[in-house]
Amino acid sequence: MDRKTDLRLWAVLFWLAAWQIAAMALAAVYPHGELLLASPADVLLRLGQLAVTAAFWRTVAWSAVRIFGGFLLATVLAVALAALAAWKQWFRGLMAPLVAAVKAVPVASFIILALVWLNSQSLSLFISALMVLPPVYLNGLEGICRTDRRLLEMARVFRVPLGRRLRGIYLPQVMPYFRTAVSLGLGLCWKAGAAAEIIGLPAGSMGERLYTAKVYFQTADLFAWTVTIVAVSVVFERLFLALVDRLMGKAGL
């Protein structure tokens, strides 16, 4: 274990201990202090109870399919739009105010507006895609625009096929930007998707479980579902980035 990992572990243990002490202090002061702040032990116990049920995994899968589906949809669309914007200056100008608006408007506003157009079942997919689109588009566009023009001119003069140009010139330049955008987008899509589910309350979603726990003051459940969302987000990010790195390695990038 290196020093950096060791420091992170101690930091996590410190905050878990602080959380446990705060929960115990509230329980000592108030008759029902656990309603205000569940202890880490209670949350872990409740998470274990939930994790052995089929309903828990159905709920996780329900949300994961829609949120990650929105991420994939936005990623494909953003890459295509970035390529077109790099090729056509007028299209880049056309996209600029739209991307700026999506970045500036609060996600809650988009969620409420989207509920006018969509049913709650598809809300998290749409909102996740909407939040992922700007960072992937902008990073992809920057990567393409920073491609060495001398290499492109040389490829044009020697009539290098498009496939070889993509692999030998564009991909090595764009992939670092793409990887950064993917890492950022995966975090954004889960935050936005969970917010959409909490507001839209689609049946069978993790957002609905969070809202129900809040209504009935089931604080341990509230923390357990929050931990689940964070854990699933981290797992998806690690797996997807590992896949990207593997593909880059196979392509010799």
State what each model feature region is:
Residues 89, 180, 224-253:
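C-terminal transmembrane helix and the adjacent membrane-cytosol boundary/short C-terminal tail
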Residues 126-130, 162-196, 224, 240:
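Transmembrane alpha-helices
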Residues 3-30:
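N-terminal signal-anchor transmembrane alpha helix
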Residues 26-72:
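Periplasmic/extracellular loop-to-transmembrane helix junction in inner-membrane transport proteins
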